Amino acid sequence: MSVANLKDLLAEGVSGRGVLVRSDLNVPLDEDGTITDAGRIIASAPTLKALLDADAKVVVAAHLGRPKDGPDPTLSLAPVAVALGEQLGRHVQLAGDVVGADALARAEGLTGGDILLLENIRFDKRETSKNDDDRRALAKQLVELVGTGGVFVSDGFGVVHRKQASVYDIATLLPHYAGTLVADEMRVLEQLTSSTQRPYAVVLGGSKVSDKLGVIESLATKADSIVIGGGMCFTFLAAQGFSVGTSLLEDDMIEVCRGLLETYHDVLRLPVDLVVTEKFAADSPPQTVDVGAVPNGLMGLDIGPGSIKRFSTLLSNAGTIFWNGPMGVFEFPAYAAGTRGVAEAIVAATGKGAFSVVGGGDSAAAVRAMNIPEGAFSHISTGGGASLEYLEGKTLPGIEVLSREQPTGGVL
């Protein structure tokens, strides 16, 4: 797929031009509104810095969380503007609205090297509307913010699987380019699918089988092994006839898991032991049991030491590794060993020459929470959902639109 990128745009020249950048700045906040993981802000900075250094007038569109009924003060991008400014080493203006009077006035007042962050793009319901006309109307207002000669740079990989106004529709109206982050993510995913070093090991965790069913079915015919951990492993174990106590369970997926185990028995790898406890709490005492001996009334919150050893041995021989989803409730120290053990095994394999990709989301958060150097992996993705959909073989609207011919005048 041929897509114009940031280097192409910089070669054309952006001095004094308006550039609308769709970034993924959807970072987690604690109860006080403090950012707890700035990974996505850090990852978004290189594209923005390159444009600012080239004297562009930069307008950034981004979202935070999922506002339900318009503007929500708890989901304002105000703390993001401060953190982004620290990363860029310059002041980041924050508009008081998305495409209203304040945003337009601030955008018109920009000079080369200035940056304006629009308020949470999802405060405008048209951003995520299923109605094409609604989304296009918002996209046209975004075009007005960058004016004549304006261009669009797509750099929010975490949202390219969404057909949304600031991701998809805007690229049909403005000359469009892939930012550094999006270009790098696509290069890595293409390497995962087209030039895989064998053996190819996939590690999947997280809560629900239903969330990962598509990628399991797709990768089961491509990977040499798929390790199953996290909350989703209990539905697979139940499909094998084991009692899982009060562990997370998707009853309606048991038959599906049974079918997967029958079809891909030589690929799927499940835990052999678990760390269980009475309640979902950090201070609830842990107990290690075999998968066939989970007591009634107890729930699994992590894979056990035997499983860690088994999975680590498998990963030590891998040539390519894709990891998406923690092995347990890593936020609770007593139940973080599984995730840490798998992460360290992937790091060791990477050190021996394996190509390793951490598929964004909770896996990336776990790596940072455990203070494992990000450079110890070949690549850490910023888009868990987008990565999974790509590996499922789905078309990513925000990428597909970048491959189209550049639009010409008359968009307004």
Swiss-Prot record:
The keyword Cell inner membrane does not apply. GO terms for cellular component: cytosol; extracellular region; plasma membrane. InterPro entries: Phosphoglycerate_kinase (IPR001576), Phosphoglycerate_kinase_CS (IPR015911), Phosphoglycerate_kinase_N (IPR015824), Phosphoglycerate_kinase_sf (IPR036043). GO terms for molecular function: ADP binding; ATP binding; phosphoglycerate kinase activity. Keywords: ATP-binding, Cytoplasm, Glycolysis, Kinase, Nucleotide-binding, Transferase. It comes from the Bacteria. ATP binds at residues 212, 300, 331, 360-363. GO terms for biological process: gluconeogenesis; glycolytic process. Monomer. This is Phosphoglycerate kinase. It comes from Mycobacterium tuberculosis (strain ATCC 25618 / H37Rv).
